[in-house]
Amino acid sequence: EDFEIVGFVFMTDVVRKNAPDILGYFEEQGVDLKVISGDDPVTVAAIAARAGLKDADKYKDATTIHTDEEMEDAILKYSVFGRVTPKQKQQMVRLLKQNGRTVAMTGDGVNDVLALKEADCSIAMAQGSDAAKNIANVVLLDSNFASMPHIVNQGRRVVNNIRTAASMFLIK
């Protein structure tokens, strides 16, 4: 009764201006993006929508997932996940791989290590934890997701060069 409101504090994650372009690039390339976070799913979905993620309104609270079957259904149906534990992140990566997907995982924290280790390609941010950087296949020195299209292009170039070289050996 004796309290007086003196102000409000508003905090938000800033979405970079180029985020919609980057997400658009991945959509054009046929890359299925998943946003997996330990944060509140409504908050994660709102940020994903501001960034321009297609189907950001399809989100799931991981605390409601209790069986492997529920997890498999969720990871194939939803694009955004909140309140995800490190073990669940690993399980999601494993299930995507079991469903024939090639999985690249980005992360920066200790909570991402299990999933990074499970992924086909793991990408850590240079400003992230040492644990994430040590387990990752690639470390983004600029800690900027905007570098990802360049990584995808380089990876595809390597794969194409290997195919070309292999076909020369098989033909001759």
Which residues fall in each region the model found?
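Membrane-embedded transport module
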Residues: 51, 55-105, 109, 119, ...
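A short acidic Gly-Thr/Ser loop motif
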Residues: 38, 109-110
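Conserved beta-strand/loop elements of the cytosolic catalytic core of P-type E1-E2 ATPases, chiefly
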Residues: 2-22, 27-42, 58-66, 78-87, ...
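Conserved actuator
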Residues: 37-44, 50, 125
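Basic, alpha-helical nucleic-acid-binding regions used in initiation and control of genome expression
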Residues: 116
